[in-house]
Amino acid sequence: QMHGGIISALLDSAMTHCLFHRNVEGVTAELTVKYLKPVPQEADLRLSAWVEQKILTLYKLKAELSVGGEVLVKAESKFMEIRKQS
């Protein structure tokens, strides 16, 4: 089984890249991970992440890790946007 800390890091990274895709730089302010079933080490993983809500500089995101179409882990997070200084 895959270690929970690695799974958490993968989901956090997927959500971060979801923001990068929108040209938003942000930092994780809060992360909640729900482990529904064990994740096999040798499995082909599918990570999905999306923005649920944006309030000023706060982004709420969700992500899922699935194997063979079955969701094994879910995550929710809040990211704070980093404003670039000119």
Give, region by region, the residue ranges found by the protein language model:
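Hot-dog-fold acyl-thioester-processing enzymes
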Residues: Q1-C18
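Residue-identity detector for glycine
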Residues: G4-G5, G26, G68-G69
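Hydrophobic beta-strand-centered segment that forms part of the acyl-chain substrate-binding groove
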Residues: S13-R46, V51
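HotDog/MaoC-like acyl-thioester-processing domains
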Residues: V39-Q41, E52-S86
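Surface-exposed loop/turn and secondary-structure junction residues enriched for glycine/proline
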Residues: G4-G5, A9, E30, E42, ...
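Conserved beta-strand segments that form the floor/walls of ligand-binding pockets within enzyme
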Residues: Q1, T28-K34, R46, K60, ...
